[in-house]
């Protein structure tokens, strides 16, 4: 059974990597990753994908397949919705599991990700809550566990 992770880009590598590391630490290690690329952030893509691949491999899985949805304009709302909807529905068709990460990205992109995750019934809709600002910009292993909370909004609703 495939496990899918759907997220968006950020110029802050930690904002994209830390939620995945927290999910892996909790036992959710994906086989495939979908990243929403935002115009102006393409220079960060190689760094982000490299870190995401490394995290998954370090948690005992093979290198994940990574698919990037590149936007020409960050207000392509239909394409943003499709970025989240397609892997969620595909996971349902193949009896896989899918997690939508709403942590990184612009606020409206996170709002779309949240709505799509709930509306299309993703197995998990994750947000990595960091309780202390002093740890912003720090990579997952450098943040004390008591400062982190991986919230699954599917358990909240």
Predicted regions and their residues:
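Long, low-complexity, Lys/Arg-enriched
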Residues: 1-97, 111-157
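Short glycine-rich phosphate-binding loop at a beta-alpha junction
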Residues: 97-103
